[in-house]
Amino acid sequence: MLYNLLLPHIHNSHIANLFHYITFRSGLAIIITLSLSFVTGPILIKFLRTLQKNGQPIRLDGPESHQTKAGTPTMGGIMIILSSCLATLLLADLTNKYIWITLFGFISFGIIGFMDDYAKVTKNNHYGVRGKSKLLLQGIISLIICILLEYTDKNPSHLLNIPFFKNLSLDLGYFYIVFAIFVIVGSSNAVNLTDGLDGLATVPIAFTAGSFALISYLVGNLIYSNYLQLTYIPNTGELTVLCAGLVGSCLGFLWFNAQPAEVFMGDTGSLSLGSILGIISVITKHEVVLSIVGGLFVVETTSVILQVYYFKATKGKRIFKMAPLHHHFEKHGWEESKVVIRFWIISVIFALIGLSSLKLR
């Protein structure tokens, strides 16, 4: 909004001219989302505690230490969604189609997550909305997003770029739409599975969003994209502002979500954040890089898949003491804080490997 209001005055005012730069607006987005989180956090937490007498239901078959979390309110993802959306609407170019498509997916998946959290709180169990129903809704929203991207682009690309190799890509044709839906839905649920300990998912999400802030900026810049031999996609640079806002809102949320957590982001936060990372990776044509930068989410999801299939195949045997993987280490006797910090370190390594693919070809 500010960008669009100040755009006619960029040549007459030094302050207005600053808003012409994506980097300036991105830095401002971090400051605004952090500030909004610090201000609204205590108010929202108090409100959620009033509404949720018992807080988020805790699994009885989980680590015993988790029973101390009983009574902690959920739906804290509302804080992240509101601060990110407000900063984006304030600072991004509102004539940019990618901003609106991404926000549509972000809010829609947040609504699905809210429905799930609401069902858990009202029914006082950790099951919530049926898994098949959630997947169906996620698939429909992802399909709408893919159709919007397909038919608002004059020359839609169905290429899947392979990182670390020069000019190596696969032409998926219209199957790319199916693949894109898989990326968005998969990313959403992968983040959801990772969000099982205080602060565990928040920092990796921030690292991934920060990585895609850089990727969006480079891909949307003709000079940098040509230099790095990346697919140039006009107007994606504005997504840098949105990604920066996500970084700030996640760090602001971490202030209240660090152990012992005052609030959980719930499915409201995890499903929406996972989806927006998937959407941005599809827009920037860095879907495979997302699986590297967000490698921690892939590892956590893989541990669940392996556990389920092995359990069924062996009629009751398990690979891990408990899945997702972070619970396995808790069952091994690791303190929650140690699991979280070590997983953060791993997420940094994944992010660096993913970003190195931009240059190493």
From Swiss-Prot:
Pathway: Cell wall biogenesis; peptidoglycan biosynthesis. Keywords: Cell cycle, Cell division, Cell inner membrane, Cell membrane, Cell shape, Cell wall biogenesis/degradation, Magnesium, Membrane, Metal-binding, Peptidoglycan synthesis, Transferase, Transmembrane, Transmembrane helix. It is a multi-pass membrane protein. Its cofactor is Mg(2+). The chain crosses the membrane at residues 28-48, 74-94, 99-119, 133-153, 168-188, 203-223, 236-256, 263-283, 288-308, 338-358. It comes from the Bacteria. It is an enzyme of class 2 (transferase). Signal peptide: none annotated. One of its GO terms (cellular component) is plasma membrane. NCBIfam families: mraY. This is Phospho-N-acetylmuramoyl-pentapeptide-transferase. The lineage of its organism: Bacteria, Pseudomonadati, Pseudomonadota, Alphaproteobacteria, Rickettsiales.
